């Protein structure tokens, strides 16, 4: 991806915050923001909400490699994200331009309603990802659709890569190609980075302000799930994960969770076309922690851009747009279809 940041929006933090705060306002007014919601029942008597944006049957494909049967692009959102996140709305626009159907399965607790089960979601949630992809494939094929493609944003991208690693040769039976965008593939490095300095003051506080109330609501439905005083006193993601995310999802502690959930150590196991896009100036992800060519399989393409921030990639004159990244990623995915 060839990306040049606007001169008026320098630095990783501005390139992260501006799209999330300003660009999303314009995107929320677009027709693509009018999703159709479907609720799936899960095997553990819970639910997953999926927001669909269907392409018009007459929409021509932009890429000659796109098959006549409409592909489905599935997006797995980031930490505390949703189908209303700026990147989800931007991908919805691009999918429509390609004549593809589009779906955003929500991780538990992120669709606007607290789930019933004790579990929430986490960065290594590959079993949940696999179940969602299977449901998407079954539904899309039953409707006469074409291949399934997947993109994961930040946390969702790490979980998607972990699914591909665990699925091995069988992954290609479900997904034609996948991409991760600004994903913390080394969770230990990223977890420590987001807990320091400006990151701690701004991003960590923002995440915890959303995650703590959800955890407390889950506690009301599942008494004894965790110590509420300790959770409310948590000051960063390390402490929150140690009290809630790790023990609730079967990990010993934060260190065990971050180590076992990280996709980077297993990227040599990926057996289908996969793209990993990261910005060198991402404030969440230290550049030194990004995977290198020698650490991934021949099926993995690495794009490391100098700028872009964390899932930002603003472009153009004030007030900028955020189509550059979704357009580049979608074009790469389309290029993997035969």
Listing of model-derived features with the role each one plays in the protein:
Residues 14-65, 314-316, 320:
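N-terminal cap/lid segment of alpha/beta-hydrolase-fold proteins
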Residues 55-116, 135:
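Short, surface-exposed "cap/lid" segments of acyl-processing enzymes
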Residues 280-301:
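Conserved loop-alpha-helix segment in the C-terminal half of the alpha/beta-hydrolase fold
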Residues 306-338:
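Catalytic active-site module of serine/aspartate enzymes centered on a nucleophile-bearing elbow/loop
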């Amino acid at each position: 991806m060839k990306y040049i940041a606007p001169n008026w929006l320098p630095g990783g933090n501005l390139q992260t915050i501006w799209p999330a705060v300003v660009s999303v306002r314009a995107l929320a007014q677009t027709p693509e923001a009018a999703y159709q919601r479907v609720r799936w029942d899960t095997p553990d008597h819970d639910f997953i909400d999926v927001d669909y944006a269907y392409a018009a049957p007459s929409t021509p494909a932009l890429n000659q490699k796109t098959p006549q049967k409409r592909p489905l692009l599935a997006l797995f959102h980031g930490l505390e994200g949703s189908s209303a996140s700026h990147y989800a709305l931007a991908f919805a626009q691009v999918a429509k331009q390609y004549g593809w159907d589009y779906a955003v399965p929500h991780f538990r607790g992120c669709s606007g309603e607290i789930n019933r089960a004790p579990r929430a979601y986490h960065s290594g949630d590959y079993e949940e990802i696999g179940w969602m992809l299977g449901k998407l494939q079954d539904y899309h094929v039953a409707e006469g659709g074409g291949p399934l493609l997947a993109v994961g944003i930040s946390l969702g991208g790490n979980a998607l890569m972990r699914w591909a690693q665990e699925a091995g040769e069988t992954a290609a039976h479900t997904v034609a190609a996948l991409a991760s965008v600004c994903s913390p593939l080394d969770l230990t490095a990223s977890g420590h980075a987001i807990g320091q300095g400006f990151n701690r003051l701004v991003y960590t506080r923002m995440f915890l302000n959303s995650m703590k109330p959800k955890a407390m609501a889950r506690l009301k439905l599942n008494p004894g799930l965790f110590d509420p005083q300790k959770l409310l006193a948590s000051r960063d993601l390390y402490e929150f994960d140690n009290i809630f995310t790790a023990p609730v999802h079967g990990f010993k502690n934060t260190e065990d969770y971050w180590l076992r959930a990280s996709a980077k150590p297993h990227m040599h196991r990926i057996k289908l076309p996969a793209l990993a896009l990261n910005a060198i100036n991402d404030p969440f992800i230290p550049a030194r922690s990004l995977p290198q060519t020698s650490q991934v399989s021949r099926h993995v393409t690495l794009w490391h851009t100098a700028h872009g921030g964390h899932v930002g990639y603003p472009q153009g004159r004030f007030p900028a747009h955020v189509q550059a990244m979704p357009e580049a990623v979608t074009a790469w995915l389309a290029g993997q279809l035969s």
